[in-house]
């Protein structure tokens, strides 16, 4: 039974039992800052269990995408080395919100496992909480599980209700006993039943956990029965698939085998049992779905976890000899396996490929140098008998070459050494403190100030003369005089500079007083009505009480206001096209773009994006005036002005009317909509469950973007000798031609392999009754080498053969040994004998092995030594 069938049968079964099939929520938990990633099926129903949310159904079932990497739940270091650890997995679950309870939950589970999945009942064991007689009796008396296969588990974690079979969401709140179902793999696998000293073995594998939320636990630890008990169950799809497909490792199921084959294809590795291929296959799932849900590689939070996973996959590819980006090429394989179940993956395929490729290209620029340093350090350490790698070196690899600590630890573990984490942490802390000291002038919000307020004039002016310096700060401390070259913060009594707020970035510009010139890099608020002008004093001295001429960077401001005004028009258009459920969830307006996050539960279609662009550009063409009014908050709301949910507003607010848009806004804007010039959406993506993101550009940025697209379109048309209007059908013709040529090429390669096989067979040397052949095939690829190898083995009947090819400075090697000779000559050893001489390594089965190398100059010598090497073996 394929993974896709197992998933669909689960959902269909519970749907037939009155459950609503609920789509998987985002891997980025909505409104839960305590959780890095969604790591179980119940996460999207947490508020329902807590009683703070209600759904239109009381029974639900789902297949939830989940990630365990980073934070409390982190399986990253074990992935690829064990049978069942993954960064990404799917959790099948059924849920009852005050509807059915233990009896139905247990009966449903048993029916699905034994009737739908047809697992042998005598292979299933169950556990119950020691005091849960109700669950025990249901299993024993109603389901009919023999008593010797029902295990009571008590408080085995050192405290009351601290048990593998008692679940609690937190120290207080909903909790209750649980019942776990185990599958017995049989006596050929070591391990004991749950609750026994040997329970950590692999014979008895947990496949399903049924949680019965029965009590509410208060701060004193008192358990009070819930008026409406709930059920939360979870079954790992990969685990149950391994059971149903009669394999012991999750990596042997059909879904993973397809991804592992893809990883082998892209890394040119024939031995699909290598742990590195398992790592790559696992990581493409986690990385792709994180990107689908709006996470992008970065240096903090979720983005850094994603970067760590991507770079771990790249390192394992590098370990296999892959020196160019390959990881992003597996997205297509993943879509083929999971795109039907998760259409959002297929829809985001090109974006996922783009993000992964960019991250790969970035890391491949440094990985070779970093690995050279790391390999040398490890070799030196082992030569000296050491066991702990210097943490300072690990930090250098992190800081200079982009090696996450766990990547270095991964390499160290393979060499049976560890990394000094304490020294790494100390180096990291030291760097952060230095950065914090260097950047103190940026921390305007933390400065102490008790002087007069700043009066903002930037709605009407970009420059002002005679404004007074009321305070100066250097390194976070108040000073009377700022010296040339110092960075700090200047506070003025009046200013045309807009201070960052409401998503709009702060202004840049200059403050000039005689010879003193202060370059303003940013403007932020020290207090709600006190502006801090952050920057560096280029020359001269500046004192408190000096008067300065303040000049805002007019070009930068103009680009920013175009983007801000366009944001308002876009918000209105989004509500018009998608519905009034659209609410702003965040924004960033800078000179380059506007980024707008909003509530919506589906990706925008191309047609919707075009419609939004048309609405906004029509507003721009109308050249309507922008009108700003200050009025009481209640009056503003009554007038129809949109306010942001959860935002705190003063008694009097500024209402901005631009075109048909009307919002509360304190930002700066164009005078008329025509000043925006042009509007173009360039990015649409998901960032969290029910949250979408749009990025757009305006004015000259939009014009340059479209000109660039036009230029590339013309280049493509010229390359295909077609007019731009004929490009699509011309591409179709070229694709047809390519496919036809590829078929013809395959035929020619097959003929070549056959003819070369005949010619090469005559070159074989007899060594003690075994035919030995080592040859280089010019122009051959790996497939041709394999086909030629098969023909030679058939023709020679008893032989040891090495075939090689060189392309783009890289060596491809295939070794083959006929079955009668594998007891004396192993193909894996033979191919490694040659590979080591050409800067590579490889492996495979005793009868067939593959390798690669990077030094083709040594290939003739290496091939010449094959006969002598085989002679020594036989």
UniProtKB/Swiss-Prot annotation:
Domain characteristics, as noted in the entry? Consists of three domains; the N-terminal catalytic domain, the editing domain and the C-terminal C-Ala domain. The editing domain removes incorrectly charged amino acids, while the C-Ala domain, along with tRNA(Ala), serves as a bridge to cooperatively bring together the editing and aminoacylation centers thus stimulating deacylation of misacylated tRNAs.
Its chief place of residence is cytoplasm
**Amino acids binding Zn(2+):** 564, 568, 665, 669
Cofactor section = Zn(2+)
Q: Which GO terms describe its cellular component?
A: cytosol
Note how many cofactor molecules are bound and how.
Binds 1 zinc ion per subunit.
Which GO molecular function annotation, any one, does this entry have?
tRNA binding
Pfam families recorded: DHHA1, tRNA-synt_2c, tRNA_SAD
- Give GO BP annotations, semicolon-separated: alanyl-tRNA aminoacylation; negative regulation of DNA-templated transcription
- Output this protein's name: Alanine--tRNA ligase
Subcellular location(s): the record lists: Cytoplasm
Q: What class of enzyme is it?
A: ligase
**What family is this protein classified in?**
Belongs to the class-II aminoacyl-tRNA synthetase family.
InterPro entries, sorted: aa-tRNA-synth_II/BPL/LPL (IPR045864), Ala-tRNA-lgiase_IIc (IPR002318), Ala-tRNA-ligase_IIc_anticod-bd (IPR018162), Ala-tRNA-synth_IIc_core (IPR018165), Ala-tRNA-synth_IIc_N (IPR018164), Ala-tRNA_ligase (IPR050058), Ala_tRNA_ligase_euk/bac (IPR023033), DHHA1_dom (IPR003156)
Q: Which UniProt keywords apply?
A: Aminoacyl-tRNA synthetase, ATP-binding, Cytoplasm, Ligase, Metal-binding, Nucleotide-binding, Protein biosynthesis, RNA-binding, tRNA-binding, Zinc
Recorded hits in PANTHER family, A to Z, give:
ALANINE--TRNA LIGASE, CYTOPLASMIC, ALANYL-TRNA SYNTHETASE
According to the record, the signal peptide region is none
The domain of life is: Bacteria
What EC number(s) is this enzyme filed under? Answer: 6.1.1.7
What SUPFAM superfamilies does UniProt report for this protein, alphabetically?
Class II aaRS and biotin synthetases (SSF55681), Putative anticodon-binding domain of alanyl-tRNA synthetase (AlaRS) (SSF101353), ThrRS/AlaRS common domain (SSF55186), Translation proteins (SSF50447)
């Amino acid at each position: 039974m394929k993974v896709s069938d197992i998933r669909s049968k689960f959902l269909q079964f519970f749907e037939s039992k009155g459950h609503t099939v609920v789509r998987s929520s985002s891997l980025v938990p909505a409104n839960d800052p305590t959780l890095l990633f969604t790591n179980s099926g119940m996460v999207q129903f947490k508020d329902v269990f807590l009683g703070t949310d209600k759904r239109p159904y009381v029974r639900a079932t789902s297949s939830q995408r989940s990630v365990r990497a980073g934070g409390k739940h982190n399986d990253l270091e074990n992935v690829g080395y064990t049978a069942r650890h993954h960064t990404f997995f799917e959790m099948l679950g059924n849920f009852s919100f005050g509807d059915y309870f233990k009896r139905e939950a247990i009966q449903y589970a048993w029916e699905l496992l034994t009737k739908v999945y047809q697992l042998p009942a005598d292979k299933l064991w169950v556990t119950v909480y020691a005091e849960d007689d109700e669950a025990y009796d249901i299993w024993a008396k109603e389901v009919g599980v023999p008593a010797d296969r029902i295990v009571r588990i008590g408080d085995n974690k050192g405290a009351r209700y601290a048990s593998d079979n008692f679940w609690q969401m937190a120290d207080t709140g909903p909790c209750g006993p649980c019942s776990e179902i185990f599958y017995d793999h049989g006596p050929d696998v070591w391990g004991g039943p749950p609750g026994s000293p040997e329970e950590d073995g692999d014979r008895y594998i947990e496949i399903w956990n049924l949680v019965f939320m029965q009590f509410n636990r208060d701060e004193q630890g008192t358990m009070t029965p819930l008026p409406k008990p709930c059920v939360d169950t979870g079954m790992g799809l990969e685990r149950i698939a391994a059971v149903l497909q009669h394999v012991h490792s999750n990596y042997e199921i059909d879904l993973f085998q397809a991804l592992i084959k893809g990883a082998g294809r892209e890394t040119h590795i024939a031995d699909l049992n290598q742990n590195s291929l398992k790592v790559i296959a696992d990581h493409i799932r986690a990385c792709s779905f994180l990107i689908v849900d709006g996470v992008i590689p970065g240096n903090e939070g979720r983005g850094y976890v994603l970067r760590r996973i991507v770079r771990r996959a790249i390192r394992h590819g590098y370990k296999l000899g892959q020196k160019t980006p390959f990881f992003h090429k597996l997205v297509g394989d993943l879509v083929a396996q999971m795109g039907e179940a998760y259409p959002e993956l297929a829809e985001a395929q090109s974006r996922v490929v783009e993000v992964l490729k960019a991250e790969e290209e970035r890391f491949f620029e440094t990985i070779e140098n970093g690995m050279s340093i790391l390999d040398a350090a490890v070799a030196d350490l082992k030569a000296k008998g050491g066991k702990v790698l210097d943490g300072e070196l690990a930090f250098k690899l992190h800081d200079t070459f982009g090696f996450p600590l766990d990547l270095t630890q991964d390499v160290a573990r393979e060499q049976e050494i560890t990394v000094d984490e304490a020294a790494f942490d100390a180096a990291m802390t030291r760097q952060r403190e230095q950065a914090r000291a260097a950047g103190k002038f940026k921390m305007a919000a933390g400065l102490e100030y008790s002087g007069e307020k700043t009066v903002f004039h930037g709605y009407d002016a970009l420059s002002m003369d005679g404004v007074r310096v009321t305070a100066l700060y250097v390194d976070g401390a108040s000073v009377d005089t700022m010296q040339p070259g110092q960075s700090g913060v200047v506070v003025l009594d009046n200013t045309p500079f807009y201070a960052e707020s409401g998503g709009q970035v702060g202004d840049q510009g200059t403050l000039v007083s005689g010879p003193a010139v202060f370059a303003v890099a940013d403007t932020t608020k020290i207090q709600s009505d006190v502006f801090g002008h952050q920057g560096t004093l280029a020359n001269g001295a500046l004192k408190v009480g000096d008067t300065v001429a303040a000049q805002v960077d007019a070009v930068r401001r103009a680009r920013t206001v175009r983007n801000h005004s366009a944001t308002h028009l876009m918000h209105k258009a989004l509500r018009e096209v998608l519905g009034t459920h659209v609410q702003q969830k965040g924004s960033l307006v800078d000179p380059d773009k506007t980024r707008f996050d909003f509530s919506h539960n589906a990706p925008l279609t191309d047609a919707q994006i075009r419609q939004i662009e048309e609405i906004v550009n029509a507003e721009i063409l109308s050249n309507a005036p922008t009108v700003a009014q200050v009025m009481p908050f209640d009056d503003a709301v009554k007038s129809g002005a949109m306010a942001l949910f959860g935002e705190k507003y003063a008694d009097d607010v500024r209402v901005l009317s631009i075109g048909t848009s009307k919002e509360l806004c304190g930002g700066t804007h164009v005078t008329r909509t025509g000043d925006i010039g042009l509007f173009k959406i360039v990015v649409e993506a998901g960032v969290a469950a029910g949250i979408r993101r749009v990025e757009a550009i305006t004015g000259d940025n939009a014009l340059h973007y479209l000109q660039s697209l036009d230029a590339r379109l013309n280049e493509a048309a010229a390359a295909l000798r077609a007019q731009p209007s004929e490009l699509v059908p011309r591409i179709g013709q070229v694709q047809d031609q390519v496919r036809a040529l590829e078929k013809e090429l395959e035929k020619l390669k097959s003929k070549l392999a056959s003819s070369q096989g005949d010619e090469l067979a005559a070159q074989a040397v007899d060594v003690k009754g075994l035919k030995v052949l080592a040859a280089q095939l010019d122009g051959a690829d790996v497939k041709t080498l394999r086909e030629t190898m098969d023909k030679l083995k058939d023709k020679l009947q008893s032989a040891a053969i090495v075939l090689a090819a060189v392309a783009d400075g890289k060596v491809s090697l295939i070794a083959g040994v006929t079955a009668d000779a594998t007891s004396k000559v192993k193909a894996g050893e033979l191919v490694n004998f040659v590979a080591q001489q050409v800067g590579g390594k490889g492996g495979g089965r005793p009868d067939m092995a593959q390798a690669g190398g990077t030094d083709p100059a040594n290939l003739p010598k290496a091939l010449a030594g094959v006969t002598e090497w085989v002679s020594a073996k036989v």
